[in-house]
Swiss-Prot record:
Family that this chain belongs to: Belongs to the MoaD family.
Alphabetized SUPFAM superfamilies for the sequence: MoaD/ThiS (SSF54285)
Annotated metabolic or biological route of this protein: Cofactor biosynthesis; molybdopterin biosynthesis
Transmembrane feature ranges: none
Protein name, entry field: Molybdopterin synthase sulfur carrier subunit
Function: Involved in sulfur transfer in the conversion of molybdopterin precursor Z to molybdopterin.
Post-translational note: C-terminal thiocarboxylation occurs in 2 steps, it is first acyl-adenylated (-COAMP) by MoeB, then thiocarboxylated (-COSH) by IscS.
Keywords per UniProt: Molybdenum cofactor biosynthesis, Nucleotide-binding, Phosphoprotein
1-thioglycine sites (modified residues): G77
Disulfide bonds: none
Glycyl adenylate PTM sites in chain numbering: G77
CC terms in the record's Gene Ontology section: molybdopterin adenylyltransferase complex
Gene Ontology biological-process annotations: Mo-molybdopterin cofactor biosynthetic process
Amino acid sequence: MIKILLFAGLAEQAGTQAIEIDMEQATTDEIKASLKEQYGLESIDTAMIAVNESYVKENTSVSSGDTVAIIPPVSGG
């Protein structure tokens, strides 16, 4: 299982802050594409990704037991 954590507007759009996917391996790009399709998360393309509390680059490999945080851009003043 790979645990996905969603924050801010992404969590609101998905209706949940945490999702578990039953995969042994995936890339961060595959996870984002899957969530975009399943939950209609259009703004996921601009989100930052962290795996096990460390920011990663696009298309990073993720394994079962990892936690992936998807953090949308924050704006405000």
